[in-house]
């Protein structure tokens, strides 16, 4: 497993940033390897499930993903349930004046590639 963290400040209010991050249909807009998203449930709630198709060095893969934490304007966490590259991405949001600081705490493994 590889653990990592990154922080960025976005020039948008926290409610706007959270709405964008928590909507899995936006993943292809900001995660380069994600080609598409298909929903099993209505997204943007704790427990929602969806599938992502990703282009990886070994070819295209599908991960079933669950939204395991959903705290509006504070935190959203995605965790893979299937696929060759298990991952957990937790996005923590903090209001900084009129901006939003996002801290990503991630864990990913390439064990299935």
Task: Name these PLM-found stretches.
Residues 38, 65-69, 79:
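A short, surface-exposed loop/turn module that caps and links secondary-structure elements
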Residues 49-55, 76-82:
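Short beta-strand segments that buttress and anchor functional surface loops
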Residues 3-5, 60-64, 86-90:
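Short, surface-exposed coil-to-beta transition loops
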Residues 55-61, 110-113:
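Short, cysteine-centered beta-strand-loop-beta hairpins and adjacent loop/turn segments enriched
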Residues 1-46:
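Hydrophobic ligand-binding cavity/cleft-lining segments
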Residues 45, 51, 64, 90, ...:
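C-terminal and inter-domain tail/linker signature
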Residues 81-113:
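Beta-strand/loop substructures that line and gate deep hydrophobic ligand-binding cavities in soluble
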Residues 14-15, 42-45, 68-73, 92-101:
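A short, structured loop/turn motif at beta-sheet edges
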């Amino acid at each position: 497993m590889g653990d990592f963290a990154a922080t960025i400040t976005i020039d948008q209010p926290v409610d706007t940033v959270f709405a964008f991050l928590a909507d899995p249909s936006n993943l292809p807009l900001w995660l380069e390897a994600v080609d598409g998203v298909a929903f099993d449930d209505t997204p943007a709630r704790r427990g929602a499930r969806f599938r992502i198709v990703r282009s990886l060095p070994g070819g295209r893969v599908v991960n079933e993903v669950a939204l395991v934490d959903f705290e509006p304007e504070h935190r959203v966490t995605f965790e893979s349930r299937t696929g060759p590259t298990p991952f957990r991405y937790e996005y923590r949001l903090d209001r900084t004046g009129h901006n939003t600081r996002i801290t990503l705490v991630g864990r990913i493994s390439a064990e299935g590639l």
